[in-house]
């Protein structure tokens, strides 16, 4: 009799590695491991071998880097989306894409189940399951961390040893690490006590600023309607562009934040995020927008950037609201074209010049000299009208 199938979101890490024997033992399902490559820098052949060795009947490795950067990272970039003003959404943006790919493979394989290794306290369980439901609500979810008796990473390591599963962590130094082409996140371990400064030895993408290059690096980034297309005059693919900026930013100590964030599930958590290339792109994009967007549009867009960040963080990527915000953002980006030069030095990013034909800045108007469009005398009438509410309030308070 043919067994039913389960599609497992597989990384080769601790959680998903022990899930394979657990699924076979508790559900008697054929496990199809799926690794979505969004730039983790893992050896995918080794990941495949490990999945098979651990008990998977089949392994898919899907190269989704180009789609991830073009359709997720660059959309968030155009919106300047951040969560709680700091988090650049590295994990949040990857999960909807992974959910979409998992459903596609489940349909291809005729699998009724999808399994993920997200903990019952984290955001990713919501992101995966909302994403999956957006494409096929009939698929059944198996979430081991909400079911099994394993309560900690230490327990998980013990279970792995019991089942003969090799894992790349130890009980002495346990971090939860998520990596893709946009960022690397670090959680757990001593980070769980906010009194502790984080250990910079954990960095994998960024050189600590004090150890970074002693000479500044200059980089030119060309944007076409809000989308980065060239570095130092050379047009390159989105993946190559982000990889290049990751290297440049990392060498100059750029792009690390240590934050306490409000999780979707209601608790606070602390994370250290390395996002060198993304940090450079966001700074350059905002600099270009400061010249090319009018005040009303810029301020409205800044308000909506927070909402966009919340939508992405909460796993609501496949929603009408996100699509509607993208439509608004695309209109605002019509004139966001030009080259931004940045100076990078020991963790700092400084504007070193902007070249655009669409600048709304006019030196003749902004300077103290005479202008046909603006007379110094014009300010007097404007100030009288602008200050009228303040004058009325003062009179009423007498």
UniProtKB/Swiss-Prot annotation:
Keyword tags: Amino-acid biosynthesis, Arginine biosynthesis, ATP-binding, Cytoplasm, Ligase, Nucleotide-binding
Compartments it resides in: Cytoplasm
Broadest EC class assigned to this enzyme: ligase
Binding site residues for L-aspartate: 119, 123-124
Any one Gene Ontology cellular component term annotated for this protein: cytoplasm
EC number, as in UniProt: 6.3.4.5
Catalysed transformations (reactions): L-citrulline + L-aspartate + ATP = 2-(N(omega)-L-arginino)succinate + AMP + diphosphate + H(+)
Source organism, top-level taxon: Bacteria
Binding site for L-citrulline: 87, 92, 123, 127, 176, 185, 261, 273
GO molecular function: argininosuccinate synthase activity; ATP binding
HAMAP family in the cross-refs: Arg_succ_synth_type1
Protein name from the UniProt record: Argininosuccinate synthase
Gene from which the chain derives: argG
